[in-house]
Amino acid sequence: MSTAAPILLTPGPLTTSARTRQAMMVDWGSWDDRFNQLTASLCEQLLAILNGADSHHCVPLQGSGTFAVEAAIGTLVPRDGKVLVLINGAYGKRLAKICEVLGRSFSTFETAEDEPTTAADVDRLLCADSDITHVALIHCETSTGILNPLPEIAQVVEQHGKRLIIDAMSSFGALPVDAQKVPFDALIAASGKCLEGVPGMGFVFARKESLAAAAGNSHSLAMDLFDQHSYMKKTGQWRFTPPTHVVAALHEALLQYNEEGGLPARHARYAANCQALMEEMGKLGLRSFLPAAIQAPIIATFHAPKDPRYQFKDFYERVKAKGYILYPGKLTQVETFRVGCIGHVTPAQMREAVAAVSEVLREMEVLDI
């Protein structure tokens, strides 16, 4: 079994459609009115996905999703603020590292990698520390695929009069979040995840009042979202050279997103991908790290086979030779590997990928799963 181009079963970058790739074949002038209109249309469509046009601004930013996360924390958390960082995986730890590097006061609450943070945990922590001004949460922790209970946590944060910053990198566009029902100061996502664009830009949905009050907070010129938004509102342009081809690709990806049926349809396809993956991997005896109740249909983590003949690098290269790119594990306690359910892929392709995994395990003579 082989494919002409590898299928990326990863959480981003991921497999994109031919239409999305073709959109990058046109060169754009960064100051041209047509490109400014493209940016404005993009922000309008992104805001519509979370029903945020009345309450939030969409501020795009060049770079990886982590650039946008750092920009959001640096812009929206005052220099005398304090962040409660909720951690149950590598990307929660990255939030804490960002706060440390930025010089923002922070505390952490860490649960096991297979244990969601609960609203009760957050309530207790906020009651115990009145200095906390902001709470930072990973919606879907990409190191495992675990889904944290965002709506419940958001309500507790609001009840305490605090501000919520959501890293929705691996969930935005596939898992529903309504800005009029889930209170947040910032929700951060990126082009190369569930929207099926290419990597190269992030965007922050910032509460209008909070962004308006954020002048002078940022540690950085390039990552100042207040300045980025102000300049874009005044001129229609990005402050610094924009990733023009990435913007064009994301605009085209959003056209396809809406043609597919928007968030409900995207979620349904990813859920079907995840179900097909779990069913077929289960037939091979490969065990999911997470119980189904807390597994998001974004990326799945599997226990590595116990057989000493299994070595991930060899396994990875053999599966890649059959046309599929997997992802290494990112857990601290047990050996795992990960398979993404997102991107321009179908349940049938997920089954074909598992068939390739089965062939590889036989070739490696891995018997003890």
UniProtKB/Swiss-Prot annotation:
Please list the GO terms describing molecular function.
2-aminoethylphosphonate-pyruvate transaminase activity
Question: What top-tier enzyme class does this entry carry?
Answer: transferase
Keyword annotations for this protein, in alphabetical order, are:
Aminotransferase, Pyridoxal phosphate, Pyruvate, Transferase
What top-level branch of life does the organism fall under?
Answer: Bacteria
Statement: the UniProt record of this protein carries the keyword Transferase: yes
Family named by the database record: Belongs to the class-V pyridoxal-phosphate-dependent aminotransferase family. PhnW subfamily.
NCBIfam families per UniProt? PhnW-AepZ, PRK13479.1, transamin_PhnW
Q: What is this protein called?
A: 2-aminoethylphosphonate--pyruvate transaminase
Specify the species: Pseudomonas fluorescens (strain Pf0-1)
